[in-house]
């Protein structure tokens, strides 16, 4: 009698897991990301630039300099001074474009991303990444790390950021060159070796919490990669 009850319990757990996955995928389809909101990437970029304060200040300074030169164009001394000011403000304006697309390095943000991956266990190119992207965009806005809710333009860009994070050595880690690249090769390593390499690489991390989440997220990504490539090459006997 007991085995029969155990089987029913296992079946119920499987059904609940399946329903849970279906609910996550269904909700992910209803999420609106910047790529769905804006007509093109250029319009998205212009919108972001208009809400980026350093960009706004530089643009105003450049506009004022040009206006002053136009008004006082008959004064030779002013032409030299204001011409130089236009050059300087132009450099400042262009320099704001460099940090505009730099990866955010806030540790809380990165831990949040790792936990999102651990929780949702997304497949490679899976719809779960839409939910993760939406949550991360909201987190950035709520914590004042970005001025809009559109930091990640698409789920693909969020996934690329995660891959960048996985391959990056966290600050405070002191490892030798033979172990330094462990995270960049963990996807191709056998299952029983990947975790050991990652743990060895981060055994000197100054943040054990980040280290623990990092290792777990790497394992989730490794499983997703293996499943993805098994489906792509079913006859390749991929471990």
UniProtKB/Swiss-Prot annotation:
Residue ranges annotated as Extracellular topological domain: 76-79
Domain of life: Eukaryota
Compartments (UniProt record): Membrane
Transmembrane portions of the chain: 55-75, 80-104
Disruption phenotype: Cells lacking all 10 proteins of the DUP240 multigene family show no obvious alterations in mating, sporulation and cell growth.
Keywords, sorted A to Z: Membrane, Transmembrane, Transmembrane helix
Ranges of the Cytoplasmic topological domain: 1-54, 105-239
Outcome after substituting residue 42 to T: In strain: CLIB 219, CLIB 410, CLIB 413, CLIB 630 haplotype Ha1, K1, YIIc12 haplotype Ha2 and CLIB 382
Assigned protein family: Belongs to the DUP/COS family.
Name under which the protein is recorded: DUP240 protein DFP3
Organism the protein comes from: Saccharomyces cerevisiae (strain ATCC 204508 / S288c) (Baker's yeast)
Lineage: Eukaryota, Fungi, Dikarya, Ascomycota, Saccharomycotina
